[in-house]
C-alpha cells in the first residue's frame, strides 16, 4: 500500500525546480531590460557630446540668429531694446536646441509647443472686455477658521515631504515640460537637458570665436 501511494504522489523536487527556473528567467529578463534601457539612455545622452551633433546645432543656431536679425530689421516699430534682443536670441537658441533634439524628449517638445502657443496668441484678435463692477464680499469668522485650518494642514504636508522629493520637484519646474512628471522622468529629462545646454554653450563659444576672428581679419588686398 505504501509503495502504491509513493507511486501516485508526484515528486516535489520538480515543482521546486520549476519555481527556481521561473525566478531565474524573470530575473534575467529584468536585468536584460534594465541593461537595454540604460544602453538606450546612454546613447541618447552621448549624442550631445559628439562633434557631429554640435555642428548640426551650430548650423541651426546660425540660421535662427540670422532670422532674428532679419525680423528685428524688418520691424516697423522702434528699434528693440537690448533686453528684447537678448530675449529673442535666447528663444532662438532654445528653439534650435529643441529642433536638434528632434522631439525625442519632453523638454524639446515643450519648447516647440510653447512657441506655437505664443504664435497663436499673437494671431488672435483682442476681444472687447466688459467692465465688471467691484463686489464686496463678507467673510464670516467660520470661513476664516476653516481657511486657517487648511493652511495649517498644507504646512504639515509640506513638512512631511522629504527634502529630496522637494528638490526634485523644484528641478522639474526648471526643466521645460517636467513640472508635473514623476521623479524618474524628471531626473532622466534633467540629465538630457543639462547635457544639451552644455553643448549649446560650447557651440555658442565656438560661434563667438569664429565671428571675432572673422571681424579681426585684415581686409583682402
Curated annotation (Swiss-Prot):
Free-text disruption phenotype from the record: Hypersensitivity to salt (NaCl) stress during seed germination and during seedling growth and development. Hypersensitivity to hydrogen peroxide H(2)O(2) and methyl viologen (MV).
GO biological process: regulation of DNA-templated transcription; response to hydrogen peroxide; response to oxidative stress; response to salt stress
Domain bHLH: 148-197
UniProt biased composition (Low complexity): 26-41, 72-82
CC terms in the record's Gene Ontology section: nucleus
Induction per the UniProt record: Slightly induced by salt (NaCl) stress.
CDD domains noted in UniProt: bHLH_AtIBH1_like
Subcellular location per the Swiss-Prot or TrEMBL entry: Nucleus
Entry-linked InterPro entries: bHLH_AtIBH1-like, bHLH_dom, HLH_DNA-bd_sf, IBH1-like
Subunit structure of this chain's protein: Homodimer. Interacts with PRE3. Binds to RSA1.
Functional note: bHLH transcription factor that binds DNA on specific sequence 5'-CANNTG-3' in target gene promoters. Negatively regulates brassinosteroid signaling. Together with BHLH148/RITF1, regulates the transcription of several genes involved in the detoxification of reactive oxygen species (ROS) generated by salt (NaCl) stress. Confers tolerance to salt and to the oxidative stress-inducing reagents hydrogen peroxide H(2)O(2) and methyl viologen (MV).
Full protein name: Transcription factor bHLH148
UniProt source species: Arabidopsis thaliana (Mouse-ear cress)
Phylogenetic placement of the source organism: Eukaryota, Viridiplantae, Streptophyta, Embryophyta, Tracheophyta
